[in-house]
Amino acid sequence: MVKISVIGAGNVGSTTVQRLAELEPGEIVMTDIVEGMPQGKALDLMQAGAINGYDTRITGTNDYADIANSDLVIITAGIARKPGMSREDLIKTNSKIIGDVAGNIAKYAPNSIVINVTNPLDIITYVAMKATGFDPEKVFGMSGVLDAGRFASFIAEELKCSKRDVEAMVIGGHGDLMVPLPQYTTVSGIPLPELLPEKTIDRLVERTVNGGAEIVELLKQGSAFYAPSAAIVRMAEAVIKDSRRVLPASAYLEGQYGQKGIYFGVPVKLGANGIEEILELKLEDSQCEILKKSSETIRKGISKLEI
């Protein structure tokens, strides 16, 4: 039986628990600092199991001790973006929150794999790794799966085809300098540049980069949670099933892509040990330049941390 703990019972956390419960991993613990919220949502989700047909045990708690012996811990805690805010605006507040969260993960679930979802994603994942003291391959961030999903959705909409036929790839930082890769994006195996003109692809790339902000502006309060939770569960499933799926993730680089000592979105193999392998792709010069700028932004953010 697999035990999964989700830290943060807000929209992303609770929706993730719902999707995970339907996979029937065994046990899920949802924890939050707000008294009553994780307990109430857990009770609601347990009752949904009688209707949707899953027997997953779901516990809501305010006590970190309840995450003890978790196989997988998913961090969704922290404040969300508001209109006009960038992911980088969240550095100071969320780094303190996640530093505390990570310390409790190290204390109660020292053998777990950790997926971070809190923004600014690449910087906060670095905080989580440092604060837990875990090996870097056991701590990684959810970024590219979500960004690639948005890219794929826009492509399917443009081509009027099934989303199931689109396989997209997005790398780089989870922010304004992410790098969608049309040359590694296919529709039923057909490279995207064979199906759409360059100007159209550029437009879809731009919308992908601004995909999260577009939703924030429309919602006025809060940020996306349905697509992020779907992306989290895709990654979690690869870990708990040891399927070694090739997915983009924010991984700790030690020389790959010319970067060292930072977290960065790259294609990886995900399995029971976390990041089993980092895959390096040949990139165009313009894409390499954006990646360089993205890495500089991440390094600048890390330099502001007090860890």
Curated annotation (Swiss-Prot):
Catalyzes the reversible oxidation of malate to oxaloacetate. It catalyses: (S)-malate + NAD(+) = oxaloacetate + NADH + H(+). One of its GO terms (molecular function) is L-lactate dehydrogenase activity. Disulfide bonds: none annotated. It comes from Methanosarcina mazei (strain ATCC BAA-159 / DSM 3647 / Goe1 / Go1 / JCM 11833 / OCM 88) (Methanosarcina frisia). The active site is at residue 174. Gene3D superfamilies: Lactate dehydrogenase/glycoside hydrolase, family 4, C-terminal (3.90.110.10), NAD(P)-binding Rossmann-like Domain (3.40.50.720). Pfam families: Ldh_1_C (PF02866), Ldh_1_N (PF00056). This is Malate dehydrogenase. Its EC number is 1.1.1.37. The gene is mdh. Belongs to the LDH/MDH superfamily. Keywords: NAD, Oxidoreductase, Tricarboxylic acid cycle. One of its GO terms (biological process) is lactate metabolic process. NAD(+) binds at residues 8-13, 32, 94, 117-119.
